[in-house]
From Swiss-Prot:
Residues covered by region (Winged-helix-like fold): 213-261
Quaternary structure annotation from Swiss-Prot or TrEMBL: Interacts with CdvA. Interacts with CdvC.
Role noted for this protein: Part of a cell division machinery. The CdvA, CdvB and CdvC proteins polymerize between segregating nucleoids and persist throughout cell division, forming a successively smaller structure during constriction.
Entry text on domains: The winged-helix-like (wH-like) C-terminal extension is necessary and sufficient for interaction with CdvA.
Organism: Sulfolobus acidocaldarius (strain ATCC 33909 / DSM 639 / JCM 8929 / NBRC 15157 / NCIMB 11770)
Protein keywords: Cell cycle, Cell division, Cytoplasm
Entry protein name: Cell division protein B
Induction remarks: Induced around the genome segregation and cell division stages. Down-regulated after UV irradiation, indicating division inhibition in response to DNA damage. Expression is highest in dividing cells.
InterPro entries: Cell_Div_Complex_Comp, WH-like_DNA-bd_sf, WH_DNA-bd_sf
Compartment list: Cytoplasm, Nucleoid
Keyword Protease: no
């Protein structure tokens, strides 16, 4: 009798060790996909920054049509960044959830929502990061295999409603966090092009000496919706950064602007 109990105990222990190893491998593979997504975000942010500068330059030069094209491309890029950030954050939540798998009895409550989430993420990033989508498909198969091996999934298995609810909640949380993150990382898009850029351009062209007026800065600020890039102003108005800061300080002293950060 004791020999039989010992065999059962050893069998369960081996299954737990195997489960732990398999979960760890999946978590590491998911981390690799997070690294890929992080690199994709970095590249898109660089492109966003380049286009943002082109929008400002085009508006100042009075090329409204070109500025509009650049602004639309920025909008598309930011939609992609949001999708990728959502995937990144959702994967992080999946990894944390996998870490909670300790006992064989609780496997199904973790693996079912994980499979739902990975399947949804695969479809979301397919057109943006196809290599990540392929990897997620493979990882989903691995999770499915674990579910079958542990008995959590079979032909007679009924997927509890709570699994779908957990998956939905995790995705919604990731989307909200991604929206906040994108707003924090990227400057607000310039206001719709107006006649202001043309006036700024005329002021620059009519200035024969390297000087920067308060009106120029105010018009620039109105054009960008409050965003100030000192390096850009210094370069495009052909003045020093100190002169830019001096004008900004004068405007702040007059109560015309408020400098933050």
């Amino acid at each position: 009798m004791f020999d039989k109990l010992s065999i059962i105990f050893n069998s369960d222990r081996k299954r737990k060790v195997h489960l732990s190893k398999a979960i760890t491998e999946i978590s590491l593979k998911l981390k690799e996909q997070q690294d890929r997504l992080d690199e994709a975000i970095r590249r898109l942010r660089e492109r966003d920054k380049d286009l943002f500068e082109k929008v400002i330059r085009s508006q100042i030069e009075g090329d409204i049509a070109r500025a509009t094209i650049y602004a639309q491309e920025i909008s598309d890029i930011r939609k992609m960044i949001k999708i990728i950030y959502t995937a990144y954050l959702a994967i992080e939540k999946v990894r944390l959830k996998l870490d909670t798998v300790q006992e064989l009895q609780g496997v199904s409550l973790v693996l079912f929502p994980v499979m739902r989430i990975l399947g949804e993420l695969k479809e979301q990033v397919r057109g943006i990061a196809p290599e990540v989508a392929l990897a997620l498909d493979s990882i989903t198969s691995s999770v499915n295999s674990i579910a079958i091996e542990t008995g959590a999934l079979s032909e007679k298995t009924f997927v509890p409603t709570v699994a779908d609810e957990q998956a939905k909640q995790i995705m919604e949380e990731a989307q909200k966090m991604a929206e906040v993150k994108v707003r924090e990382l990227l400057p607000e898009l310039p206001h719709p092009p107006s006649e202001l850029p043309k006036r700024v351009a005329k002021q620059v062209q009519s200035s024969n000496k390297k000087s920067l007026s308060e009106d120029m800065i105010l018009n620039y600020i109105k054009t960008t919706g409050g965003f100030i890039d000192v390096d850009y102003i210094a370069k495009n108005f052909d003045v020093s950064k100190d002169e830019v800061f001096n004008v900004l300080r004068r405007l702040e002293e007059k109560g015309l602007i408020v400098l933050e950060g």
